[in-house]
């Protein structure tokens, strides 16, 4: 908000000055007879009266008090830890837009096409919800980078610190039935260390502590009315890992640059792989080529469906394969993963991530615990992914038998951690982009990445 200029100081009353001068003139004038008789004294009288007039003006100056200066209004800033709802900081819902990128090559006409600009202006609600979610993601991750993600911190403290920030900034704490469906976490916070690339979040009782030599991927989502912003970054404290992080960050930026309406997925994957695999990492005297993890992909994002639902599309990060094209109006998570290992991940470690299967067929459930849990999942998460800590937070106890029954019945999908070979290091960077009619908007772009 622009600061209000301080009001001007009160001006002198010129009328009173003028009145004093006129009074002096009358006193000095008098009758001609008196002037003739007292000619010698009249000059002194005029001097005295002029002095009196000056004293009167000075007295008036002293009587007029200066108005107190109004305090300048300062723009509200986010607290630390983040607790101020974003709508308080942006009361008019004029949230910052993401990075605007013009379409390349044959799609460049869209940038200037009047009809496309008109269609784009019609999507204000859609854009407002995405931009709100993106700004929350930026503010929370910047706090996490400065205050939470440090050697010696537990993964549980980091995850809960991020999630508490998101809930406060959306204004929805998710403790009342259905509240998490209005706004909140788009999916659980992934904190994936070293050879683990994705889908690891601490369960209750987790004691893992972040170490100085770790490479950790931080992946979390924010949603407003089901509009999910999916963005991730990698943290390494030892600069020896900088080439790995740079390779993956540049590969993601290449994917964003190549993405666009009518662009083939295979072309994007080829460009990503070429960029990433031009780097190598030297560790303890050994050079490791950085490989794109070939069985991990970017993806479309649907409303309340992180992977786009049954008609979702995948964005490969290696060459070959899918000839499907991107289309106008779609939302994509452009994410790339690099590894010093085999460049291929498998299920490993304890599962934390789950999600209800969209449009799952009706299945009879024999376990009452499974029935009750499925009802709770429907009412609180819908098709949004959740983790076991979220069930703990809602007061659920001894639910693992029912949860496993829902998975085996095909009503809920389990997403175990995805890992390359032990001893390897993996990195990830990810942004959400909107293929608007006239431009693509990198909605989650920030100053950090």
From Swiss-Prot:
Domain of life of the organism encoding this protein: Eukaryota
Acidic residues: compositionally biased ranges: 34-50
Query: Where is it located?
Result: Cytoplasm
Which cofactors are required for activity? Answer: Co(2+); Zn(2+); Mn(2+); Fe(2+)
Kindly report the protein's main subcellular placement as a broad class: cytoplasm
Q: Which residues bind a divalent metal cation 1?
A: 219, 230, 430
What is this protein called in UniProt?
Methionine aminopeptidase 2
Tell me which species this is from: Arthroderma benhamiae (strain ATCC MYA-4681 / CBS 112371) (Trichophyton mentagrophytes)
| Lineage, highest ranks first | Eukaryota, Fungi, Dikarya, Ascomycota, Pezizomycotina
């Amino acid at each position: 908000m622009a600061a209000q200029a301080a009001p001007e100081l009160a001006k002198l009353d010129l009328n009173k000055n003028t009145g004093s001068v006129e009074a002096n003139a009358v006193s000095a004038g008098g009758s001609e007879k008196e002037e003739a008789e007292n000619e010698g004294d009249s000059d002194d009288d005029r001097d005295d009266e002029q002095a009196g007039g000056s004293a009167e003006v000075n007295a008036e100056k002293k009587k007029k008090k200066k108005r107190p200066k109004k305090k300048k209004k300062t723009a509200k800033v986010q607290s630390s830890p983040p607790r101020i709802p974003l709508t308080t900081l942006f009361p008019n819902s004029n949230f910052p837009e993401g990075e605007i990128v013009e379409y390349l090559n044959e799609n460049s006409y869209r940038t200037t096409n009047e009809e496309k600009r008109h269609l784009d202006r019609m999507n204000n609600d859609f854009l407002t919800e995405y931009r709100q979610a993106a700004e929350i993601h930026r503010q929370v991750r910047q706090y996490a980078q400065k205050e939470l993600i440090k050697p010696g911190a537990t993964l549980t403290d980091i995850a809960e610190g991020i999630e508490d920030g998101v809930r406060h900034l959306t204004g929805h704490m998710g403790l009342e039935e259905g509240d998490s469906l209005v706004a909140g976490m788009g999916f659980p916070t992934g904190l994936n260390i070293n050879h683990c690339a994705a889908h690891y979040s601490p369960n209750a009782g987790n004691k893992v502590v972040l170490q100085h030599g770790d490479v950790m991927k931080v992946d979390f989502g924010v949603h407003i009315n089901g509009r999910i912003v999916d963005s991730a970054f990698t943290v390494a404290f030892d600069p020896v890992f900088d080439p790995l992080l740079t390779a993956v960050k540049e590969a993601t930026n290449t994917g964003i640059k190549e993405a666009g309406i009518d662009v083939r997925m295979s072309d994007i994957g080829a460009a990503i792989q070429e960029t990433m695999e031009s780097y190598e990492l030297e560790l303890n005297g050994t050079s490791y080529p950085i490989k794109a993890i070939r069985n991990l992909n970017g993806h479309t994002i649907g409303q309340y469906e992180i992977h786009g639902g049954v008609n979702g599309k995948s964005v490969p990060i290696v060459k070959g394969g899918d000839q499907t094209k991107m289309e106008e109006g779609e939302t994509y998570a452009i994410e790339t993963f690099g590894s010093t290992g085999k460049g291929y991940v498998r299920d490993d470690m304890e599962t934390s991530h789950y999600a209800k299967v969209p449009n799952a067929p009706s299945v009879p459930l024999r376990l009452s615990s499974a029935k009750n849990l499925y009802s709770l999942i429907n009412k609180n998460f819908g098709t949004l992914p959740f983790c076991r800590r979220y069930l703990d937070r809602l007061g659920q106890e001894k639910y693992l038998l029912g949860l496993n029954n829902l998975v085996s019945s095909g009503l809920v999908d389990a997403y175990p951690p995805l890992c390359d070979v032990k001893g390897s290091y993996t990195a990830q960077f990810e942004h959400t982009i909107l293929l608007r009619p006239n431009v693509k908007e990198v909605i989650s772009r920030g100053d950090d990445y």
